[in-house]
Design a protein with these regions (language model features):
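S-adenosylmethionine/decaboxylated-SAM
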Residues: 1-169
Length: 169
């Protein structure tokens, strides 16, 4: 997560907002809460959401939303943000949906951060197909995290960088 800190620790981000889709137990949420003025943390699993709240109980700039982003609803309940951080399902269809929904909730000039980019080929394919489809409105800003060849959780080897940051317009 050091790359997130490097990218967003500048004072200009202190007044900005981030939408974190799939906050799990709140570890990344904690980092984001120190970088941004407002954090909206989305999680479908009630137990994980409660863990995230407990882990971040001293961080008062986090709002939690319990929502299954794949339950057929669009992200209508979610606010517009300067950054959207996604660590959801990793299959092609889900990633494509996440990216399409992200730009509906992203300010121009904002960023989409995709976690686990180098672990799942379907995620990587969906990202690159989406970039092509957006015809210049989405560009690769930078790759982040562990590099190709690194060993990740459960011994899985990265086939590319751990994460990717996309710039919108």
């Amino acid at each position: 997560k050091i790359d997130l800190i490097d990218m967003f620790e500048d004072d200009k981000w202190k007044s900005c907002s981030v939408l974190e889709v799939a906050c799990y137990k709140g570890y990344t949420t904690s980092i984001l809460s120190k970088l941004f003025e407002r954090v909206w943390a989305v999680e479908s699993n009630k137990s994980f959401l409660e863990s995230a709240k407990k882990y971040n109980e001293k961080n008062t700039n986090i709002r939690y939303i319990r929502e299954n982003v794949y339950a057929g609803r669009k992200w209508k309940r979610f606010p517009i943000a300067d950054v959207v951080f996604i660590d959801c399902n990793h299959d092609y269809k889900s990633v494509t949906s996440d990216l399409e929904q992200s730009i509906e909730h992203l300010n121009d000039g904002g960023f989409i951060v995709m976690d686990d980019y180098g672990l799942f080929w379907q995620l990587k394919d969906a990202v690159h197909d989406f970039i092509k489809k957006m015809d210049g409105e989405i560009t690769i800003h930078k790759y982040i995290g562990e590099p190709e060849g690194s060993t990740a959780r459960k011994g899985k080897v990265m086939n590319d960088w751990e994460g990717i940051i996309l710039k919108y317009k």
